[in-house]
């Protein structure tokens, strides 16, 4: 909804003008979110009026969490995120919703509040519209999603003694990953968690899937778990792409220019985008070749 996005962006004046045109069943939550953002005297009353929506509307939850944190009640903010209901509608800005969850889940983990950290970080699915694949999302959204699922999986496995929950999180991590390194990492750790849960069948299945990426570190660890030798790795010459307008993607041209004129940070941002968007052998060969041409071996490592 338009108002949902306005509230998410803290565009309170514009949101106030549009609230009257929203659907009756969502209007109380929008009014409560607006009152909370404005620090209105009746904000708490508006939240009570919203009833169940107070815990299921992303824009209202975010407003309440921010208000609690600003008042110094970080534990209350984390508890709200951990105990919330399933979202009534997809988050208005997915990457920002995930950043909200990640910020508080990481803080909870750092403070030793492992159950809270898991319950915040593991609630990733209800924010996504039905039928939408995380693999198709932009880099920022996928990065925050994988950070959340990795945090939830590692906490479940290492701190809470819940390996079956860890399996589900690591499998989500792998499903959202595009590079062989990150995909094999998620599958390998899903296998480790399944083995710890005494589910040897599932563990073997995850190791099998990870071992497909035998050129990566975790793919090789998966082969070790399966007691298989390393296959013969075909030698592929890494040829740098021709840097000419119209013949290569814009991001490669931008990386080449950044290597000549930009800062190290600018270069790294472009190289990271190239590595994260690589999809297929040709892309990885081109990335490694470009790293050699531009004198940036770290791009080869990223890829």
Where are these regions (language model features)?
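Cell-wall glycan-active module
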Residues: 1-303
């Amino acid at each position: 909804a338009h108002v949902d996005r306005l509230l998410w962006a803290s565009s309170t004046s514009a949101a106030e003008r549009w609230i009257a045109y929203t659907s009756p069943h969502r209007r109380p939550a929008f009014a409560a979110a607006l009152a909370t953002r404005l620090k209105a005297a009746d904000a708490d009353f508006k939240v009570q009026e919203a009833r169940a929506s107070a815990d299921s509307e992303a824009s209202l939850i975010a407003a309440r969490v921010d208000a609690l944190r600003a008042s110094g009640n970080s534990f209350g903010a984390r508890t709200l995120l951990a105990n919330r209901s399933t979202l009534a509608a997809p988050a208005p800005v997915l990457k920002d919703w995930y950043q909200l969850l990640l910020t508080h889940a990481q803080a909870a983990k750092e403070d030793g509040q492992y159950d809270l950290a898991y319950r915040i970080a593991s609630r990733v699915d209800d924010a996504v519209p039905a039928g939408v694949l995380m693999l198709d999302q932009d880099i920022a959204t996928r990065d925050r999603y994988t950070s959340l699922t990795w945090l939830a999986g590692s906490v479940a496995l290492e701190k809470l003694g819940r390996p079956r929950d860890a399996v589900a999180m690591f499998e989500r991590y792998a499903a959202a990953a595009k590079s062989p390194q990150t995909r094999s990492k998620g599958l390998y750790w899903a296998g480790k968690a399944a083995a710890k849960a005494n589910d040897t069948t599932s563990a073997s299945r995850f190791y099998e899937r990870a071992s497909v990426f035998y050129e990566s570190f975790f793919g090789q660890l998966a082969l070790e778990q399966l007691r298989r030798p390393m296959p013969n790795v075909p030698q592929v010459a890494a040829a740098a792409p021709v840097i000419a307008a119209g013949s290569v993607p814009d991001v490669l041209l931008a990386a080449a220019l950044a290597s000549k004129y930009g800062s190290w940070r600018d270069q790294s941002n472009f190289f990271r985008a190239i590595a994260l968007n690589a999809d297929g052998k040709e892309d990885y060969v081109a990335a490694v070749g470009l790293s050699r041409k531009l004198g940036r071996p770290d791009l080869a490592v990223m890829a």
